[in-house]
């Protein structure tokens, strides 16, 4: 029976309501930068690799603004469920985690939301809450208030050339697109534009990962958005993705990076400076009945285990958060202890971490440089605007092309301090040599596309 204390706590959760926007399942129309946040159209349940699993209690929706790119992942449950949270790292961004730490033995969580956009993306969590109200699942009555919890990751900075963020429109698109038994691993949802390995200068593409396991009647699902300061490693200690420095081994191991810190292990293995705002946000779901204390320990145990798959983990530059949910559909099996359940769940979470790693953009290799006419070179020259903060000036000189950033900050390998020579790579496509990919595609008239592909950034010629 619900206590008076828990009833009063529910009353304190009432929020102001907003209008639900019209949604579209069709691809977003082509917009020209600089993009207006108001004009962006959500694209739902796309990207990544599909993972199917059998658990009717869970519905998952994902939405993105491809122009960012940035996105949201919404996990909603068939009824209110019991939740717990474990917050680590030096810079978390959360909604309603304090309430979960009150340990009320009452199932109250409707949804867990993960979002890009740093603290601006916290709007996604409250947007899901109002969507619960707007669709009639929840109401304004004191014992039927919706409760969405969630966290954000930092996906701004040098990984993209704009500051588009997930908003109410995007989050509610993900909410209404939620479907049973489907999760997308890799560059999708809140993991649409994540990175790993800034700690070592790896700057690798990352994403979101999911995994599922059933042991008898017990179901365990793990979901994580990996935007870690550290690197992702498999069970043998092999680093899964890294743009290595000169002289680094091809099969890079965690021990190669972690030993002898802070000094580099080998000559030339310096650790470059970089942004120190990273976060891994995760969710472990079990169908076993648990009380609040047991669920809290599950969150702590699984969260602690993640330091095996991400190294280093929970640093001052991370804002790591772990949610744990019990759907309470089955009793505890005979012989299954809480530490055993935590051990199994920890392995499922490691699988989810590994599933988050997408195929990496390859570094361009010039084998036979194409001939570029003087006419084409002059046509490519001009001022290109990616956003209000990033522009690039392309100039022609002596039959060659050069580029220099003219906005507030650099554009990948193109800096504000000096012109970079653009090396012909393919017809209409050029590159800037360096540790990380910097590819410039001029094949679309009046536009410049940098690093073409799923993380591409587009500018228009002024």
Language-model segments: which ranges?
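Bacterial N-terminal signal peptides that target proteins for export
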Residues: 2-11
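Peripheral terminal and inter-domain segments
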Residues: 366-462
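Bacterial N-terminal signal peptides
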Residues: 11-19
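Boundary at the C-terminal end of the N-terminal hydrophobic targeting segment
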Residues: 22-24
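A generic structural signal for short, solvent-exposed coil/turn residues
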Residues: 7, 16, 44, 66, ...
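A structural signal for small-residue-enriched, beta-sheet-centric alpha/beta enzyme cores
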Residues: 26-119, 123, 134-365
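Short Gly/Thr/Asp-enriched flexible loops that form oxyanion-binding sites at enzyme active sites
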Residues: 124-129
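Histidine- and/or cysteine-centered catalytic micro-motif in compact active-site loops
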Residues: 5-6, 225-229, 286-289, 387-389, ...
């Amino acid at each position: 029976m619900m206590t008076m204390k828990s009833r009063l706590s529910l009353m304190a959760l009432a929020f102001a309501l907003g209008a639900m926007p019209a949604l579209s399942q069709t691809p977003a129309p082509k917009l020209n930068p600089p993009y207006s946040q108001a004009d962006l159209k959500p694209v739902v349940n796309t990207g990544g690799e599909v993972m199917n699993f059998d658990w009717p209690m869970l519905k998952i929706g994902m939405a993105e603004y491809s122009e960012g790119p940035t996105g949201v992942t919404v996990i909603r449950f068939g009824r209110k469920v019991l939740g717990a949270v474990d917050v680590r790292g030096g810079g978390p961004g959360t909604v309603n985690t304090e309430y979960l730490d009150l340990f009320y033995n009452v199932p109250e969580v409707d949804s867990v939301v993960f979002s890009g956009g740093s603290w601006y993306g916290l709007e996604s969590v409250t947007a899901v809450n109002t969507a619960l109200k707007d669709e009639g699942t929840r109401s304004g009555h004191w014992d039927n208030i919706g409760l969405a919890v969630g966290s954000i990751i930092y996906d701004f900075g040098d990984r993209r050339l704009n500051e588009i963020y997930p908003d109410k429109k995007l989050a509610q698109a993900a909410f209404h697109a939620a479907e049973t038994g489907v999760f997308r691993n890799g560059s999708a949802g809140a993991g649409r534009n994540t990175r790993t390995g800034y700690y070592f200068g790896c700057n690798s593409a990352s994403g979101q990962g999911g995994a599922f396991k059933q042991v008898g009647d017990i179901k365990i699902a793990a979901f994580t958005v990996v935007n870690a300061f550290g690197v992702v490693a498999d069970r043998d200690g092999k680093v899964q993705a890294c743009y290595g420095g000169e002289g680094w081994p091809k099969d890079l191991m965690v021990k190669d990076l972690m030993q002898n810190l802070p000094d580099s292990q080998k000559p030339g293995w310096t650790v470059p400076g970089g942004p120190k705002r990273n976060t891994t946000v995760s969710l472990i779901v079990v169908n076993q009945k648990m009380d609040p204390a047991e669920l809290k320990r599950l969150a702590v145990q699984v969260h602690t285990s993640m330091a095996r798959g991400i190294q280093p983990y929970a640093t001052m530059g991370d804002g790591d958060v772990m949610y744990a949910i019990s759907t309470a559909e089955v009793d505890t099996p005979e012989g299954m202890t809480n530490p055993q359940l935590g051990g199994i769940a920890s392995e499922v979470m490691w699988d989810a971490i590994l599933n988050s790693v997408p195929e990496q953009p390859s570094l361009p290799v010039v084998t036979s440089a194409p001939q570029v006419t003087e006419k084409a070179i002059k046509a490519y020259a001009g001022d290109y605007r990616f956003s209000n903060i990033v522009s690039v000036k392309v100039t022609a000189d002596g039959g060659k092309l050069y580029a220099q950033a003219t906005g507030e900050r650099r554009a990948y390998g193109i800096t504000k301090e000096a012109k970079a020579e653009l090396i012909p790579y393919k017809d209409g496509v050029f590159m800037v040599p360096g540790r990380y990919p910097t590819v410039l595609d001029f094949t679309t008239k009046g536009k410049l596309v940098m690093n073409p592909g799923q993380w591409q950034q587009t500018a228009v010629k002024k």
